[in-house]
């Protein structure tokens, strides 16, 4: 099913960041800088013209329809439904829980500065026995609300929900759902290396220097180099921590992508949430103006199925971060009485991360990608989770 994994160095950072977040929450002017947060990994805000019904592209997991009478609450990251990525994946998961397990659910989204996260968590806890919070910036508030509502289960995406001083879960009713983003990124990096015609590829990160998005970059880089160490990789981040605007800056991502294509890249991977829309716009414009096709690689959801139709043909693949499955499994475990506090990590071995094949653009290299996947799962390839 899934496995419990503890990553000391990365989770210590998250612990420190949670403490920092608690301090920041006391100062409204400072917390206002978090106008767009990481979602799943990397939470993302939706752009204009998004499909508010997007999200349920993948097939639902199997399950017994034993959730009749059970309700669940879902609190999105800023932007809510329609971000074509992180939030939509969470929405797909709870929609699957409704259709497969038979639950009912309610949902809410924070205000623009995220200052009402705690209130939304409490509101959902007042009405539901399990609450899912999308994004690690909920962790501090979720710990507090969980302590005040011991009969309600809470699950937070992208935070371990561990008490590092005590050496165990932060609360008996709080679960942290994390992902091996570097493993999935390795596979799309390998895909980029196998598909590039120019010998140059690019990576756009949303926010630098707080340890999470570097996992995407490290895995992507390792995958590229595993295929061909001579391929050139151009990398750029939109903003640096603690400025989270990089996850909601499609114009800036487009500008960066255009520069990368101008410098010879023909495939660019983004881990930038809602900013990724700008990458696909750039790919379309360059392809149409130059007559030579360039590509973008999506993240979190299968973005071939979530982006605007006009840019769909420029989505080579997406690194799938199965937030949908994590949400579904958390609700299923609550119903079954097997809810597990603390960190649950999802990786390649349980299809918690992966790559998409929509569009058929990878059909000729799937066997090679599956061979890499098998080697990672078997432990023959160790994928780095940092750029060090």
Where are these regions (language model features)?
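Short, Lys/Arg-enriched N-terminal segments with co-localized hydrophobic residues
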Residues: 1-23
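Bacterial N-terminal signal peptides that target proteins for export
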Residues: 23-32
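Hydrophobic helical h-region of N-terminal Sec-dependent signal peptides
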Residues: 33-37
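C-terminal motif of bacterial Sec signal peptides marking the signal peptidase cleavage site
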Residues: 41-44
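Short, conserved catalytic or interaction motifs in soluble domains
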Residues: 47
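A residue-level marker of the well-folded mature domains of exported/periplasmic proteins
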Residues: 50-388
């Amino acid at each position: 099913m899934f496995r419990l994994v503890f990553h000391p160095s990365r989770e210590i950072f998250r612990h420190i960041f949670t403490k920092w977040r608690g301090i920041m929450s006391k100062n409204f002017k400072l917390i206002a800088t978090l106008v767009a947060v990481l979602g799943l990994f990397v939470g993302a805000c939706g752009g204009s013209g998004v499909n508010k019904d997007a999200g349920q592209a993948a097939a639902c997991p199997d399950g017994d329809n034993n959730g009749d009478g059970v309700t669940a609450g879902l609190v999105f990251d800023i932007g809510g439904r329609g971000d074509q990525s992180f939030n939509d994946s969470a929405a797909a998961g709870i929609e699957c829980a409704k259709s497969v397990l038979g639950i009912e659910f309610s949902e809410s989204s924070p205000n623009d500065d995220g200052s009402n996260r705690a209130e939304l968590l409490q509101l959902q806890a007042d009405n539901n026995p399990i609450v899912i919070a999308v994004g690690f910036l909920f962790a501090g508030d979720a710990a507090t609300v969980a302590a005040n509502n011991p009969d309600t289960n809470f699950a937070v995406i992208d935070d371990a929900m561990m008490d590092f001083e005590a050496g165990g879960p932060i609360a008996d009713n709080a679960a942290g759902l994390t992902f091996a983003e570097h493993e999935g990124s390795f596979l799309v990096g390998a895909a980029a290396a196998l598909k590039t015609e120019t010998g140059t590829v690019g990576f756009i990160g949303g926010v630098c220097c707080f340890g999470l998005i570097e996992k995407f970059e490290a895995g992507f880089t390792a995958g590229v180099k595993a295929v061909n160490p001579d391929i050139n990789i151009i990398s750029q981040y939109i903003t640096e921590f603690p400025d989270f605007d990089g996850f909601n800056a499609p114009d800036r991502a487009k500008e960066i992508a255009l520069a990368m294509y101008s410098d010879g890249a023909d495939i660019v991977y983004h881990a930038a949430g809602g900013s990724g829309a700008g990458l696909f716009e750039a790919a379309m414009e360059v392809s149409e103006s130059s007559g030579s096709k360039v590509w973008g690689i999506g993240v979190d959801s299968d973005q071939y199925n979530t982006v605007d139709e006009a840019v769909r043909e420029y989505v080579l693949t997406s690194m799938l971060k199965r937030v949908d499955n994590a949400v579904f499994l958390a609700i299923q475990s609550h119903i079954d009485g097997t809810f597990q506090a603390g960190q649950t990590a999802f990786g390649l071995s349980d299809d918690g991360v992966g790559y998409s094949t929509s569009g058929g653009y990878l059909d000729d290299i799937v066997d090679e990608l599956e061979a890499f996947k098998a080697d990672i799962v078997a432990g023959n390839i160790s994928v780095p989770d940092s750029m060090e």
